[in-house]
């Protein structure tokens, strides 16, 4: 069976792997631009919404599926996909430390709430840092690029924008290619998805982040308080990100830069220099729930969208569900 996948962000790449493991001939259609939301994603795999101290919906299922998925991809690609170490929450005072310890008493949170540790850098302000068990950070650009190379070698990658997509006689014509199945993984704005499935309840969020560096003692831990501070392993760090719901097409802004630096300096007093600033638009839905499914009149057309800022965590399970539905429908 020939399966076409439109888009090669976190959603499309996960779908491609699931299709590959199911034995399909995979055709990826994606221009290869590295400025999409997935390419600038921090890659945090974290079952806890740290800002609100709540669990991601279906956190336990997503974490288990994610473990198996990335282990299998790692075996296929023969490369490391993760930065070392978990994520830590910076606890500013004794009250927040006690609140963290109380979370460990909640049976839902207990598998993910780790011990508290001393702050590892003199410029960090606070009482301690709490370890988020099972958390990690995906090397997103490396994962996407290595996966693209794999599919270019073992399957088919079409580095072009899709301008023609037609349905008929139980097949799909995509850029002149006759396919048995087509999966849309466009992210925002989802042109082809909305043309076939109708309007999606998008509430896209514009995020900005900084790549920073400093002279002196490094940090090797991934940290969160009101923003993240993430070591890239080369003496540089990602700091961010912001959330905005307007001016989605605008470039990097001075306001976002100042917001990030002000928040960071509230708990990390080290003097830093900004080396780069990035912008991405997260394909978030109004209710923050992803959307996926198969077309009622065209059962060979499906889609996956709306992963928001949790794509590294949720793409494995959601892509698996979509492919399982296809296999059930086809009787394979």
What are these regions (language model features)?
Residues 1-11:
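Beta1/beta-strand and adjacent pyrophosphate-binding region of the FAD-binding site
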Residues 131-177, 181, 185, 190:
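Helical element adjacent to the flavin cofactor pocket in flavoenzyme catalytic cores
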Residues 43-126:
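Dinucleotide-binding Rossmann-like beta1-alpha1 core, especially the glycine-rich loop
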Residues 3-5, 26, 237:
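Conserved hydrophobic helix-helix packing surfaces used for dimerization/oligomerization
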Residues 276-332:
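C-terminal catalytic lobe of FAD-dependent flavoproteins
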Residues 11-22, 31, 39, 44, ...:
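Active-site substrate-recognition segment that forms the wall
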Residues 53-65, 130-146, 251-256, 313-314:
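Short beta-strand to alpha-helix junction loop
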């Amino acid at each position: 069976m020939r399966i076409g996948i439109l888009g090669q962000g976190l959603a499309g790449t996960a779908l491609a792997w699931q299709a590959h493991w199911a034995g399909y001939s995979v055709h990826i259609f994606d221009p290869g631009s590295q400025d999409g939301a997935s390419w600038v994603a921090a890659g945090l795999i974290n079952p806890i919404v740290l800002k609100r101290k709540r669990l991601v919906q279906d956190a336990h299922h997503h974490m288990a599926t994610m473990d198996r998925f990335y282990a299998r991809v790692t075996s296929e690609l023969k490369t490391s996909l993760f930065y070392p170490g978990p994520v830590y929450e910076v606890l500013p005072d004794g009250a927040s430390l006690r609140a963290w310890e109380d979370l460990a008493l909640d049976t839902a949170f207990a598998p993910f709430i780790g011990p508290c540790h001393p702050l590892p850098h003199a410029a960090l302000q606070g009482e301690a840092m709490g370890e988020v068990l099972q958390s990690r950070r995906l090397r997103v650009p490396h994962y996407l690029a290595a996966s693209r190379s794999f599919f270019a070698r073992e399957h088919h990658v079409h580095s072009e924008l899709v301008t023609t997509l037609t349905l008929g006689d139980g097949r799909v014509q995509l850029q002149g290619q006759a396919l048995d199945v087509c999966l849309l993984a466009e992210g925002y704005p989802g042109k082809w998805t909305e043309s076939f499935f109708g309007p999606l309840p998008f509430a896209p969020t514009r995020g900005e982040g900084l790549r920073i560096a400093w002279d002196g003692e490094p940090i090797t831990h991934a940290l969160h308080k009101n923003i993240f501070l993430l070591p890239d392993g080369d003496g540089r760090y990602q700091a961010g990100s912001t959330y905005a719901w307007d001016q989605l097409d605008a470039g990097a802004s001075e306001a976002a830069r100042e917001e990030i630096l002000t928040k960071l300096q509230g708990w990390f007093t080290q003097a830093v220099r900004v080396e780069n600033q990035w912008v991405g638009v997260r394909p978030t839905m109004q209710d923050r729930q992803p959307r996926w499914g198969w077309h009622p009149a065209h059962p060979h057309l499906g889609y996956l969208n709306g992963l928001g800022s949790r794509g590294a965590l949720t793409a494995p399970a959601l892509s698996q569900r979509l492919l399982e539905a296809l296999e059930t429908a086809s009787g394979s």
